[in-house]
Amino acid sequence: MATRRLTDAFLLLRNNSIQTRQLLAEQVSSHTTSSPLHSRSIAAELDELADDRMALVSGISLDPEAAIGVTKRSPPKWVDGVDEIQYDVGRIKQKMKELASLHDKHLNRPTLDDSSEEEHAIEITTQEVTQLFHRCQRAVQALPSRARRACSEQEERLLRNVVASLAQALQELSTSFRHAQSDYLKRMKNREERSQHFFDTPVPLMDDGDDATLYGQGFTDDQLVLVEQNTLMVEEREREIRQIVQSISDLNEIFRDLGAMIVEQGTVLDRIDYNVEQSCVKTEDGLKQLHKAEQYQKKNRKMLVIVILVAVIIVLLVALVAVKSR
């Protein structure tokens, strides 16, 4: 079943109404300081204008007779949660762009020395993105609990559509982030392989005497420093790879949870489609029954007319016989 996402339009209309009311309040306050009598009329006109605009936005008639039973209701509590989730989604997109630029800067650096500041920034940004994903996931799962207990069917349907839309958006973002992390991990491994190919030199075979002479001399200071630097580099690379793998595993958990939510929403939509189809079938059956009842009713009218005519004929015959007998 095709659905339309009306969340953005709803938020735009709500923000416009808030800005309009604030602007009208500022105008009323500025006119109040100038003249009290004139300010009352202006305030009344501005209130009427605001009511007209709100009526145009909401589609509610301002006719007193038509407005019977219409009450002003505050927006649902889960709308604030939707705003927070959309704000976090915007932050996730911004952080993902920053992380992509840090990855490119770290991997495409022309120098051969490693920058611990860049690696630390990559680690912090990755953790922030993962935390934002977890927060959005928990917020999306908590949206149905923030709905009113006695909410209408339209509000409940709107909430289900909003939850499905947010879950799908988060799933797409998590997939993109997971692909970016996997690509970064592959590029890291390729760089390590290229560095080993260019900098690892084969050791020539030596006799036992040369071997004893070499190890008898021991390592020089430069060789010890080089070995220590290589060890630190390998440990740093292993730590980065472990962090990337951990972030990917966390994203897999989020991906599974969001997939389960989307499956649940799809099941609800399928159930709604089934109910709509069943209602259409029952409506068609009811229409057929109405046609049959109409035909039966028409036949009953014909029989009633025939009975009345027969009764009239009998009465006339009796009257005719009575008249002739005299």
Swiss-Prot record:
* Cytoplasmic compartment segments: 1-302
Major subcellular site: Golgi
Q: Which residues lie on this side of the membrane: Vesicular?
A: 324-326
| Residues recorded as bearing Phosphoserine in the entry | 41, 74
InterPro entries linked to this entry: SNARE (IPR010989), Syntaxin (IPR045242), Syntaxin/epimorphin_CS (IPR006012), T_SNARE_dom (IPR000727)
Q: A Gene Ontology molecular-function term?
A: syntaxin binding
Where is it located? Answer: Golgi apparatus membrane
Does the UniProt entry include the keyword Coiled coil? yes
Q: Does the keyword Electron transport apply?
A: no
| Membrane-crossing segments per the record | 303-323
Stretches assigned to the t-SNARE coiled-coil homology domain: 231-293
* Membrane topology type: Single-pass type IV membrane protein
- Give UniProt keywords alphabetically: Coiled coil, Golgi apparatus, Membrane, Phosphoprotein, Protein transport, Transmembrane, Transmembrane helix, Transport
What is known about its subunit structure?
Answer: Interacts with GCC2. Interacts with BAIAP3; this interaction is increased in the presence of calcium.
| Function statement | SNARE involved in vesicular transport from the late endosomes to the trans-Golgi network.
Q: Would you identify the family this protein belongs to, as annotated?
A: Belongs to the syntaxin family.
Which named protein is this?
Syntaxin-16
Source species: Mus musculus
In the record, what lineage is assigned to the organism producing the protein? Eukaryota, Metazoa, Chordata, Craniata, Vertebrata
